[in-house]
């Protein structure tokens, strides 16, 4: 497509030059024709310029069209929401089997956006006191790294990418699901608006590329039109095409920021679901970098 566009560009340019040369050689124009020369030449230039703009759009389409204002609004709001995070939270993470059996874990988490990006630190404690701690860091450009202290381990280590999609404490949430990196991917598309339940929603499709460290090929988010907060998210895994659904309940505004009190995760083809319930915390925790020492966090067992 690029080579074809360049060929057309060259063809249009040469055609334009031929028009100018032919007109300049016609010395036997009458006064009437001479008086029309300016208009004719100007019209030729206009047509050629218009054609060149069209052809350049084939080579650089993103320069030919203004940015979608709704897309810009949705992306800006989503990124700013994440860039303003500064919270502590406590609650429980529950796996509900297809037969109704429940297994609950204590959940403690905190997050803060710093000058170098977002840090999320959380700990999940099971019924037998086994603990999983993880520290997720996302840079300002969206690059993600994960450290973890898994059950039976005494020290934190970098979690290999191959394990990012592992179930977190046996639930439908994965390690990667603890962060919303999709809003920082380069490939973003705003689909036709839809209703989700009673809510009018923007529908944003975020697609990953080879530079994005993620197990997801795409993430589609339904964001409430009025508050620009996700109410439904559908993640599609690379390779398999398997989908994971996230539903947000109990939306509330605390200190000017919107959040959900519950998030339910359902994996396609797997009975049951998992529910993260936030029971307490602070939306303006004034956290510092020292609050994200995963070794100290695991040793404390509670958040200060």
Language-model features and meaning:
Residues 25-49:
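Bacterial N-terminal signal peptides that target proteins for export
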Residues 83-96, 120:
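A short, Trp-centered hydrophobic/proline-enriched beta-strand micro-motif
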Residues 46-59:
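Bacterial N-terminal signal peptides
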